[in-house]
Amino acid sequence: TNTGRGGTINLKDDCYGKFGKFIATSLKGIEEHDGIHFNYISPINEPDGHWNWTGPKQEGTPATNREFAKVAKEVSKALVKNKLNTEILINESSDYRCMLGTHMADWQRGYEINSFFTKDSTQTYLGKTKQLLPLIGAHSYWTNTPIPYMREIRMKIREACKQKNIKFWQTELCIMGNDEEIGGGTPYDFSMKTALYVARVIHHDLVYANAES
């Protein structure tokens, strides 16, 4: 972020409603003009990322759980007002560890499953938000080695989601530079070694985390 508030959302306090209205207006305009209907909208990407937010190289935005919840509620209001049936997907976590606890950030950007789906979390609870899917989405990075840990953390996600009666979607995966087992993510590698590595990650997400997407 270039706001001088590292780790927080790049929105002014009085702009949450405007942001929700912008998303709804854009979705409605695209549908009316181009005939394209969006089944789902994810308003923020990787809010818990632990990278350097001062530059333009990351397609996400930092946000605390409270900020994310506020955005989701405003988007919900705008969708309802515009009579759109698009559903909201949260929260595109960059790291499975942030869903269960904290990782390279404080409590404000961690414990996401509990934060968004525990009724006692009065400032972040989203379980009753209109048109918000009863599930949580995340990206399958940084937790793929060693293999026993790969399975362990996904089993924990499965159990945590089961306790909150929500589903889990794995919504993004690619070969990152830290995947030393296959030599990193560049340049392009179309070998069977990489294919089997990716298949193993997907297998673990489906079987052990019970990912439905």
Mark where each language-model region is:
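Catalytic-core region of carbohydrate-active enzymes that cleave or remodel glycosidic bonds
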Residues: G137-S213
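Substrate-binding cleft and catalytic face of glycoside hydrolase catalytic domains
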Residues: T1-Q131
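Receiver (REC) domain switch/active-site residues of two-component response regulators
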Residues: N39, P134, E212
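Generic secretory/membrane-interface signal
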Residues: K130-L133, I166
